[in-house]
A protein has these predicted regions:
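Adenine nucleotide-associated cytosolic modules
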Residues: 1-185
Length: 186
């Protein structure tokens, strides 16, 4: 399940589809805006004001008709997301703000669902694989962090989230297949 279809989630979803991951879930509530184009490679100028999750579902299904692409056009919330998350083996945290990331962290802990966190800001990116109750969780890394430090306020160089999103897809493929050691496993 890819949660967030922006700069991280767009390339992550594309690579999961290209790899033939049987079922790719997509969750986002946003629409395409002109400010997205420098880093969100699934969308085009003609897509402005259209649902990101529906556009991504259409594109990924055309790209690889052998996979199932499930779309959840909704905002992340503990009430609605847990039932969706439990349907998947791994979640990719492709969100763009700490508050939502920490909410996803808690839902994944509650459902015991492994997740691959990715983040990018300015010229920097990070990624880690979190297996609930086998090591630290995302809140352990950011117990006193400020919610003021997010992409909307700080900006991000377009290729940075692309690189991190591709790494998240690679980690998800390794996790699902059991091949190799996860990079940055917490």
């Amino acid at each position: 399940l890819v949660v967030g279809l922006g700069g991280l989630g767009s390339p992550a979803a594309q690579y999961l589809a290209a790899a033939g991951v049987g079922t790719v879930g997509l969750m986002d509530h946003d629409v395409v805006s002109p400010s997205n184009f420098n880093r969100q490679i699934l969308y085009r100028p003609g897509d402005i004001n259209l649902s990101k999750v529906k556009l991504a579902q259409e594109q990924l299904s055309r790209f690889n008709p052998e996979i199932e692409v499930l779309a959840f056009d909704q905002r992340l919330s503990e009430e609605s997301a847990a039932s969706v998350i439990m349907r998947f083996d791994v979640v990719l945290d492709c969100l763009d703000n700490l508050q939502d990331r920490l909410a996803l962290n808690q839902i994944c802990l509650d459902t015991r669902t492994s997740f691959i966190h990715g983040g990018a800001i300015r010229f920097f990116g990070q990624m880690t694989t979190i297996i609930p109750f086998e090591g630290p969780c995302l809140r352990c890394f950011s117990p006193g962090s400020s919610f003021a430090c997010d992409c909307a306020r700080m900006g991000v160089l377009g290729p940075v989230p692309g690189v991190i999103g591709v790494l998240q897809a690679m980690e998800a493929i390794k996790y699902l297949s059991g091949a190799g050691q996860e990079i940055g496993r917490a």
